[in-house]
Amino acid sequence: MDDVIKKGLSIVSELRDHGFEAYIVGGAVRDYHIGRKPKDVDVVTSASPEEIRTLYPHAFQINRQFQTLTVHLQKVAIEVSTLRGGSIEDDLCSRDFTINAMALAMNGDIIDPTGGKTDLENGVIRSFHPEARFKEDPLRMLRAPRFASELGFTVAKGTAEAIKGSCSLLADVAVERVEKELTQLMIGTHRSSGWCLLHETGLYPFIPGVSLSKETVLRMKEISRSPGLLPADGFWAILYLLENCSMKLPLAKEKKKRIRTIVHYVGERQNHSWNETMLYQASLSVATVVEQIRALFGQASVHEEELRQLWSSLPIQTRTELAVTGRDVMAHFQKKGGPWLADTLADIEEAVLLKHIENEKKSIIQWLEERRVES
């Protein structure tokens, strides 16, 4: 049995020892059935949030609406929620899809009121009373193509029809909740199926924070047929590049910066080949993604091994590898810091990178002295 499941069951056991019902539910049970390692584990219990906190004083509440607390057990974060409805069956019937609506009891029994195990075996994404489920939380509609991409399953006809009839509700979902689902869709093994489903259900115009045209969705569907696996930021960069697609998602600052960098160097590669300076400024990881994007668009691309060889030949790969620091430069010139220092360090960096001087403190100081004499 997987270690994550074991840790979840230890929480279940402890809750039961204190007189509460408790079960492992959701994606962990699904993954357990298909032989996939669960990324995390959720537990539901008849205990109230206050009672959960009494048992686990260090637990913190992350979702007041669903009365969910996170309990850390040996570096594994376990979400513990109070049962919705009067029973475990009521709780499971209110979940997004049948494949996520199974519970694992302490004795190993599977509670499956909606036929999730059968749907799992048949590779079907189906919602129990889909109109009601999507009205409760419209984001669930976006999770259908996400799971189609991740698992390679097909969506049941009734569920797909319910998405078509309810898709406008998605526009009211907070944009902060959209990023995770779209990211998982983009990096799934069967991502082309996810984009296909966005198109077929008519869901794509209603995704908050992303203005997707039909042409963009169909282009992403075709691009995603490639067997090569592009990292998520590469797919986000492609969305930025494609016409008629604008982004208003509140992505993390560093993620936005990296995506913009990838987009910039995709543009640079239209007119320039990689050289030492350009590769150094971009970084090997960005350059690799840029070449993967070029390949997806049918453009001539540089093989990753060639990029690695050029990268390995660089005298330095980051400024922190310089043999001198800003403190060394200030001490040598006996001057306080200021704009001159940043300019001087940039000059040193360029000279070392272009192999005009050795990356050795004595050589750099001598070079600085020669420049001072010349000026």
Swiss-Prot record:
Cofactor entry: Mg(2+)
Binding site for Mg(2+): 40, 42
MF term (GO), any: nucleotide binding
The entry's keywords: Magnesium, Metal-binding, Nucleotide-binding, Nucleotidyltransferase, RNA-binding, Transferase, tRNA processing, tRNA-binding
Catalytic activity reported: a tRNA precursor + 2 CTP = a tRNA with a 3' CC end + 2 diphosphate
A Pfam family that the UniProt record links to this protein: PolyA_pol_RNAbd
Protein's GO biological process: tRNA processing
Broad EC category: transferase
Domain of life: Bacteria
Chain residues that bind CTP: 27-30, 95-96, 100, 137-146, 177
EC number annotated for this UniProt entry: 2.7.7.-
Effect of pH on activity: Optimum pH is 9.5.
Function: tRNA nucleotidyltransferase involved in the synthesis of the tRNA CCA terminus. Adds the two cytidine residues to tRNA.
Family per similarity comment: Belongs to the tRNA nucleotidyltransferase/poly(A) polymerase family.
PANTHER family registered for this protein in UniProt: CCA TRNA NUCLEOTIDYLTRANSFERASE 1, MITOCHONDRIAL (PTHR46173:SF1)
Name of protein: CC-adding tRNA nucleotidyltransferase
Organism: Halalkalibacterium halodurans (strain ATCC BAA-125 / DSM 18197 / FERM 7344 / JCM 9153 / C-125) (Bacillus halodurans)
